[in-house]
């Protein structure tokens, strides 16, 4: 299943672009689902059709859905929520407050992500278009698998080696202890969610099937936010294959009051094309009417893609590479707009940590690099190069063997 994720600053028109892309995919024979994770529910407005928490048919080959996070939360977390609510209420916390305390930050977005795996496994669709919330929320959404990975491992180990083996013996010792032992279905729910989250990470970072497309306007704030988004998306291993600049005024038409705005847009457009190169930049005009309903979206889709299949790969370069040159192994990350001063790199065990500001990526290293300290990272041509000298590792290994002898 081809997955296309659209994101951008609020108000740039990403929902219209997402909906138009889905319409064009369906016209080309792809069984398409467009899914909105934006709580604003703009997708219903775009199609001018009321959408619900399950896929609604728009036309042939096209369904749409607006995720209701509370429905998903109840389906996936009910047994866990019930257990913790009981514990909190035993400590004197009121029922409503106890319910709220069982929902961890990011849980609503997490269960929106889990739908992706389920739709992929069902095999009902050829293409999935994700219409996401504004950039900041999207980055939090897409980075959840990485952000929670360490905690997932810890909780799963606690469940496997402590909770499961001890729950039955301890529950038999006294009723008070038994009261605090989590039921089997709650433990299984936690394990299942964490397992699926690992699968989601693999699906979204599959650079053959899944890409992100950035929607922006030719305005300073929109450009800056899109630059940050591209940097962080690349950091987390998401391939970006296209930039769409929306709501451009006609540079040829004399528009009086808007003449100054046209000049501003043309100036920023040059900066966008230069700064985001070699990514393809698609320029989209400002329409003289609202883009609402399937007919309007069909016209918009043709302006975006023409006769091109939207499911095609518009730019094909992975954001993370492992390159070996002689005895030097390099981990390379494409970080187009990162400030080298803000980048921090370190290794713990078999994991490479790369941090930019408050965003952190954990990369599992090949076995041959485990325990080897990285050399000095170099930022060159929009790529961060992190070297590992295999010869030094060999010398270190030989020294250890000699000392043992």
Swiss-Prot record:
Q: Does the keyword Metal-binding apply?
A: no
- Can you tell me which residues bind ATP? 8-15
> What EC number(s) would the UniProt record show?
7.3.2.7
Q: Does the keyword Hydrolase apply?
A: no
What catalytic activity is recorded?
A: arsenite(in) + ATP + H2O = arsenite(out) + ADP + phosphate + H(+)
Which major enzyme category is it?
translocase
Q: Name one GO molecular function term.
A: ATP binding
Keywords assigned by UniProt? Arsenical resistance, ATP-binding, Nucleotide-binding, Translocase
Q: What does this protein do?
A: Anion-transporting ATPase. Catalyzes the extrusion of arsenite.
Q: Which family does it belong to?
A: Belongs to the arsA ATPase family.
Q: What is this protein called?
A: Putative arsenical pump-driving ATPase
What is the organism field in this record? Chlorobaculum tepidum (strain ATCC 49652 / DSM 12025 / NBRC 103806 / TLS) (Chlorobium tepidum)
């Amino acid at each position: 299943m081809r997955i296309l994720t659209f994101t951008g600053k609020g108000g740039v028109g990403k929902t219209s672009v997402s909906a138009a892309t889905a319409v064009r995919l369906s016209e080309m024979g792809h069984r398409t689902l467009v899914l909105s994770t934006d709580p604003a529910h703009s997708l219903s407005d775009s199609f001018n059709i009321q959408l619900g928490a399950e896929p609604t048919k728009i036309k042939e080959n096209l369904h749409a859905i607006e995720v209701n996070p509370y429905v998903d939360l109840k389906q996936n977390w009910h047994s866990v929520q019930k257990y913790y609510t009981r514990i909190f209420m035993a400590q004197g916390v009121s029922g409503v407050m106890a319910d709220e305390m069982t929902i961890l930050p990011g849980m609503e977005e997490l269960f929106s992500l889990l739908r992706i795996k389920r739709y992929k496994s069902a095999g009902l669709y050829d293409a999935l278009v994700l219409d996401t919330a504004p950039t900041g929320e999207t980055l939090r959404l897409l980075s959840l698998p990485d952000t929670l990975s360490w905690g997932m491992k810890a909780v799963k180990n606690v469940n496997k080696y402590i909770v499961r083996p001890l729950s039955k013996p301890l529950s038999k010792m006294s009723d008070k202890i038994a009261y605090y032992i989590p039921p089997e279905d709650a433990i299984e729910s936690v394990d299942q969610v964490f397992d699926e989250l690992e699968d989601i990470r693999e699906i979204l970072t599959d650079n053959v099937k899944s890409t992100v497309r950035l929607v922006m306007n030719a305005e300073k704030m929109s450009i800056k936010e899109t630059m940050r988004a591209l940097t962080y998306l690349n950091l987390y291993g998401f391939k970006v294959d296209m930039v769409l600049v929306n709501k451009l005024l006609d540079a040829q038409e004399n528009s009086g009051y808007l003449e100054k705005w046209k000049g501003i847009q043309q100036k920023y457009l040059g900066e966008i094309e230069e700064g985001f190169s070699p990514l393809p930049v698609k320029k989209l005009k400002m329409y003289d009417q609202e883009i609402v309903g399937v007919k309007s979206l069909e016209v918009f889709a043709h302006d975006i893609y023409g006769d091109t299949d939207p499911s095609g790969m518009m730019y094909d370069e992975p954001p993370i590479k492992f390159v070996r040159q002689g005895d030097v192994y390099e981990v390379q990350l494409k970080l187009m707009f990162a400030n080298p001063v803000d980048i921090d790199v370190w290794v713990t065990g078999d994991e490479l940590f790369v941090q930019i500001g408050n965003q952190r990526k954990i990369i599992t290293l090949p076995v041959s690099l485990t325990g080897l300290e990285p050399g000095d990272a170099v930022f060159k041509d929009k790529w961060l190069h992190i070297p590992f000298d295999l010869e030094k590792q060999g010398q270190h290994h030989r020294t250890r063997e000699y000392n043992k002898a």
